[in-house]
Amino acid sequence: VCTALNGSGGWPLTVIMTPEQQPFFVSTYLPRESSGGRMGLRELLLTVADKWRGSRAELTKTAGEITAWLRQKTAPAAEVELSALTKAAEAQLEESYDEEYGGFGTAPKFPSAHNLIFLMEYAQLKNEKKPRQMVENTLRQMYKGGIYDHIGGGFARYSTDREWLAPHFEKTLYDNALLALAYTEAWQDGHMALWRTVAEDTLDYCLRELKAPGGGFFCGQDADSGGDEGAYYLFTPDEVKQVLGDEGGHFCECYDITPEGNFHGKSIPNLLLNTRWAFLPEGYD
């Protein structure tokens, strides 16, 4: 909808619709408050509420026209076989697949759990090896990288590099819910203990950090902490040794925590180096 109306899309997506689910406003990210000549979400919602009360018929008419135009714009030119569509989708993902580090494309690189779930189900349906290999390598590389929180569990929004090392440190509920599902389905498919471990740790993170006291869940955690982006997730060897004592050295070697650091002078814990101290659950290769 956003791409069709505005020429481009993105996430988060802001769509305002009628009760009949017909859109009349669509945008990507909007700040909470208005600033720099850009309307914020709070002001927008108040403006739309006033407009809805005073000119509901006009908004409903506009929404209907947009919906009719979108249906015409997106109508298939001809009947297409479902098997042909799924094969085309698999081929497109295979074309953009990163053989070395998993995932799709270069950088920034998103987990794209929905693509992984599709490929797993496609592999099961068609009994093909390549889609399953793409999924397993991607799940493994994401777990090893800094996009995965090796201490608190859960995944960051995306990686700023191809190797999954340096994430944008925001954590979102929907990403982690979908990734927990992807790792769970991978465990059900191959019974590799690592997939179950990651799924459980991710769900534990959601229940511990994102569950609201009054019920429901928060949508995520901001990337900023301690005044800087990712400060909560960065460590020095001295900080680790203050907590772990003599075991701190082993931890630092395992998780690539060094004096020079790998991110602005500090270290993002990761298992990309495959050191001898690395904790690798049963079934990891």
Model-derived features: positions:
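Replace the tail clause
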Residues: 1-285
